[in-house]
Structures are given as C-alpha cells and as structure tokens.
C-alpha cells in the first residue's frame, strides 16, 4: 500500500516535503538534499549553515537551535521530540543563563553538531553542542548525548551497547538506489 502525504511545500524547494506547521527560520542558510520530509511542529533555527542530506526524515516536535552550524547525512532520521542544541548557556559558576540579560553576564557555549550518514536518533533524545554522531550510529530513545559517538555503534546516551551491521545496511542502500533508479551523488549536487 502506498502512503499518501498531505503536505504543503510552503518553502517551494524541490524534494522537500513540509507541512502546515513546519517552522524554519533562516531557510536561506540551509542546503537541502532530495527526498526530505520535515513533519508538522518541527522548529529549525538556521542562524548559521545547516546541511540536510537526502532521504532524511525529521519527525514532529523536533527542534534544531542554538546559533551554530548543523549537518545531518543521507538516510538519517531524527525521531519525534529530538532536541539538537548547537548552543547552550553555561549554568555552572556565576554566569546568568538566559537571553534576557546582557551577553557580558552569560557564558554561552556554541559548537557545530554533525550527524553522519545512515544514523538514527531515538525519540526525545538530546544532542548537545559540539557532538559528532559517527556514520551509521544509532541513539536510543530518551538519550542525552554529550560526547562524540563512534561510527556504526548502538548507543544509550554516551554508552555503547552494540554494533550495527555496516555491510548489510550499505547493501540495502545500494539495492534501494538501484531499484529506484536514484543516483545519490547527482541528487546531492542539485
């Protein structure tokens, strides 16, 4: 059975499916691949460069904020409620932690976040500034990720609990692209 999407391409970008309540601020700073779905109630704040690969799904109630760059590779997904922070106040010591006070009283840590190709981030997970999620890694629901994650690992928070089958996954992607007649490199260069 074929799934039907009731989407609006309110941003008029080929290969991007958005919905009525998708909110993207700074869309001119975003580079899109193809075959991307960004659900209702997603909020993306693109003050700096954001790159979203091809065949990426960003589920409802996800937010990407913080004022620094973010990338997510091909065939990756952010499940419902994921929070990507590329910037965060330092709540330790004597700093005030909110944007209503002058910058001189705050200590904001900003750093790019990178999620590699073939990754999955589980529902309600939090990825903090400066984190790189290696190619093929998956993060369990409800995780808080504060450190870089190695490729092809299965993680609960920062703790590795297993390995994914890299060869099988890459074979599946190759078969998908062959069966559908898609060429990932060409679609990413558009």
Segments from the language model and where they lie:
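Extended, small-residue-rich solenoid/repeat segments and analogous flexible loops
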Residues: 1-35, 181-190
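Short secondary-structure boundary/capping segments
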Residues: 8, 14, 74, 105, ...
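Generic hydrophobic, helix-prone segments enriched in Leu/Val/Ile
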Residues: 8-9, 14-15, 23, 41, ...
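Short, highly charged low-complexity linear segments
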Residues: 16-17, 95-98, 138-144, 175-190
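Flexible, glycine/small-residue-enriched loop-and-beta-strand segment within the central core
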Residues: 20, 25-32, 37-127, 158-168
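C-terminal/domain-terminus segments
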Residues: 44, 127-178
């Amino acid at each position: 059975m074929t799934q039907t999407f009731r989407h609006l391409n309110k941003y008029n970008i080929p290969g991007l499916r958005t919905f009525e309540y998708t909110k993207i601020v700074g869309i001119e700073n975003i580079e899109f691949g193809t075959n991307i779905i960004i659900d209702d109630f997603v909020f993306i704040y693109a003050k700096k460069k954001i790159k979203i690969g091809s065949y990426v799904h960003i589920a409802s109630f996800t937010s990407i904020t913080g004022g620094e760059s973010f990338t997510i590779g091909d065939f990756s997904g952010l499940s419902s409620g994921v929070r990507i922070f590329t910037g965060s106040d330092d709540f330790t010591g004597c700093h005030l932690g909110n944007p209503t006070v002058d910058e001189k009283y705050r200590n904001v840590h900003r750093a790019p976040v990178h999620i590699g190709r073939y990754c999955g981030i589980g529902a309600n997970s939090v990825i903090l500034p400066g984190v790189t999620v290696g190619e093929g890694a998956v993060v369990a629901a409800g995780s808080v990720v504060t450190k870089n994650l190695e490729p092809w690992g299965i993680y609960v928070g920062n703790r590795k609990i297993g390995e994914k089958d890299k060869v099988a996954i890459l074979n599946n992607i190759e078969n998908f692209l062959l069966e559908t007649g898609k060429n990932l490199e060409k679609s990413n260069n558009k």
